[in-house]
């Protein structure tokens, strides 16, 4: 199959969405499919470095300058998609490149599926201080984008429930993003490497190491872990929290740790190299997160792949993932966080090898790729079925034949409408030069 992935974010940008798309591309290619990524330009890579990655002219997005939006390229995208003979388009964003993907699919008359990655209610406050888009507007924007598509992939039951609440009627399927197991099941990581890292972090052999690994922003809710950490230390002083990552909330967390007088028990490492992340997971006794904004969260599966159980704020996605005490401990109220940590330390059993192996396949990139392709096939079969119904033969003079003639009459454009369209075209031609150039640039 020839597939086009349309996304605003892609490697080398760092995000869960970019990682998910790259993983999907690689897994589909392993199955023998042709996959082309239509995305934004990036200063860190050459525009024409890879013929399977089509980078469209873009500018930084307001309020999120590390993210970009396209401002031109519709016609060129259409020509490339037509040349590559795409059979299906898979959009990964509801904005610039996603809208472009819908237009290209409509022009080529091929199906479009979408993955809904982000709960925008948690992020609209960052766009023009929340003055441009209100949380109550999100469902209408999402509904407008999705309702004429052929299917939507939900990374978790959280997203499925959300889209049901939005009254999205198109076919939906829950397919969590998989991870590359080989990145975490590494034979080159020795016990000596693990012990050495714990020493470097100041974690003693008899101490429990809790690992927080993410972009450090307020919605990750690391502040909740810090706020309840004194309660944990009162009951069990041999616990240390290691915070890996960087972001806009980093300094605030360091100030909070100082105010709570827990500086000696909290280690801030900043960003670490991607190849070292697996060592941190293996060195930790537990991975911890109090975030309530994740639709899935790849760090949970990365931790489980490394054999490290999770302590996290429960949600439908984690209810499915953490289905055995050996995989982790969930809490559902922030005030229960400290008790959850203490319970996990005291009660978590050793991972059963067979159950862990079964879990590894369900969270693997291979399983993810096969599940997405199966959804593509269902969409294509459904699309062919619709076309057969639409173009089925009818008996001349029958009710069906008369209905078709009536439909043809109804969709014939009246001459008055043609005249009105012509007048509109004249007005467009007379539009200001800079406006015409903007339209032309986007189309080219």
Language model feature labels by segment:
Residues 204-220, 226-229:
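Conserved donor-binding/catalytic core segment of Leloir-type glycosyltransferases
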Residues 324-335, 343-349:
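Conserved acidic donor-binding segment of nucleotide-sugar-dependent glycosyltransferases
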Residues 31, 349-402:
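A charged, aromatic-enriched C-terminal amphipathic alpha-helix characteristic of glycosyltransferases
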Residues 81, 269-272, 279-284:
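Short alpha-helical donor nucleotide-sugar binding micro-motif in glycosyltransferases
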Residues 309-312:
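Short hydrophobic beta-strand element within catalytic cores of glycosyltransferases
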Residues 292:
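Aromatic "clamp/platform" in nucleotide-sugar-dependent glycosyltransferases that forms part
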Residues 1-45, 49-55, 373, 397, ...:
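N-terminal subdomain of nucleotide-sugar transferases
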Residues 39, 54-57, 135, 140-193:
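Donor nucleotide-sugar binding/catalytic pocket of nucleotide-sugar-dependent glycosyltransferases
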